[in-house]
From Swiss-Prot:
Phylogenetic lineage: Archaea, Methanobacteriati, Methanobacteriota, Thermococci, Thermococcales
Domain TsaA-like: 8-126
Binding residues annotated for S-adenosyl-L-methionine, in chain numbering: 48-49, 78, 106-109
Keyword S-adenosyl-L-methionine recorded: yes
UniProt similarity note: Belongs to the tRNA methyltransferase O family.
Pfam families referenced in this protein's UniProt entry, alphabetically: TrmO_N
Species: Pyrococcus horikoshii (strain ATCC 700860 / DSM 12428 / JCM 9974 / NBRC 100139 / OT-3)
Protein name: Probable S-adenosyl-L-methionine-binding protein PH1056
Keyword vocabulary terms for this entry: S-adenosyl-L-methionine
Record's signal peptide: none
């Protein structure tokens, strides 16, 4: 598999201190204008610690890392091992920082992009119940 390189510039980083939040870099803070407390957003992250040529070649995994689960294509899982290690999460905005309760990312994970999550297009399901038969 041959990869063509291109550059992605982080707009901020995940920070895990007393609270978990996204630290937006000063040169991108103007891009937060218009976001309000309580808005839902999508985050696009770069799993930088899963970014090696070997890990990018993994295209099938056992979901939840459990070998009892059948091998499944990474696009149908939440595995951090992907050809391009991105993930998307939904969070709320509170105050002048983007605070989040929890995220499946490490302190220092680069944030590549933030997009508004308009209810009419992408309404989150508050009471979602998984029908998955996979073992955790």
């Amino acid at each position: 598999m041959k990869f063509e390189a291109f550059k992605i510039v982080p707009v901020g980083y995940i920070r895990k201190e007393k609270n978990v939040f996204i630290e937006i870099l000063p040169e991108f803070r103007e891009g937060m204008e218009g976001l309000r407390e309580g808005d839902w957003i999508k985050l696009i992250l770069w799993f930088h610690k899963s970014d090696t040529p070997e890990l990018r070649r993994i295209l099938k995994v056992h979901p939840h890392g459990n070998p009892e689960n059948p091998l499944t294509g990474v696009f149908a899982t939440r595995s951090p091992f992907r050809p391009n290690p991105y993930t998307v999460k939904v969070h709320k905005i509170e105050g002048n920082r983007i605070y989040i309760d929890w995220i499946d990312a490490e302190d220092g994970t680069p944030v590549s992009d933030i997009k508004i999550f308009p209810e009419r297009y992408d309404c989150p399901k508050e009471n979602y119940q998984s029908t998955s038969r996979l073992k955790s």
